[in-house]
């Protein structure tokens, strides 16, 4: 049977199931089939590297790049202020990760959609005595460079409320690099803004800022970490 027909049939059955309550497992199976089409998998253990280097906002993603320091987008950070909160590598379990207050926000001075945040070291919620940020996460390292056709992965929190703040990983390849812009075909959705783009060594080469939301799109975009951008980030990593 044609694969597309199978997927559509399963989706129709899932809708019926949600109404009748026949079998909730069918819904989950349908979602798994759809994600397989997109090369997307749910992260099973967010407490191991590189997944423990990814953090969640209420509707976006960020990642750890150094002591008490995370990277996201300007269009994400504009909705936050000092004292607001982020959550380290949640996995849908309210006891996992730790919730931390934002201490400072520094936007990149150019047009590139990058913002650096510094975080209070002690969690304000979760853990019997509060998690320590730097003991609870593992910072990502910069890649030296990248080139077209390199394999990449994107880790983040697509549709975070709908997906109960579970972490997902999508895979693909770099399609083009021009100046500070990197285009790739890994599938992304709303909520992936601020996600790290990693190479096969789990080194970060850029930060996602937007995409088409279509399977196979080659125009999903990230800010490519040039030497100038890396220098800006390094200057804002807490010492």
Swiss-Prot record:
EC identifiers of the protein: 3.4.21.-
SUPFAM superfamilies attached to this UniProt entry: Trypsin-like serine proteases
InterPro entries in alphabetical order: Peptidase_S1_PA, Peptidase_S1_PA_chymotrypsin, Peptidase_S1B, Peptidase_S1B_tx, Trypsin_dom, V8_his_AS
UniProt keyword annotation of Secreted present: yes
GO molecular function: serine-type endopeptidase activity
UniProt keyword Coiled coil present: no
Segment forming the signal sequence: 1-36
Localization per Swiss-Prot or TrEMBL: Secreted
Keywords from the named record: Hydrolase, Protease, Secreted, Serine protease, Signal
GO cellular component: a single term: extracellular region
Cystine pairs: none
Pfam families recorded: Trypsin
GO biological process, one term: proteolysis
Catalytic machinery residues: 75 (charge relay system), 113 (charge relay system), 193 (charge relay system)
Family statement drawn from the similarity comment of this UniProt entry: Belongs to the peptidase S1B family.
Protein name: Serine protease SplC
UniProt gene name: splC
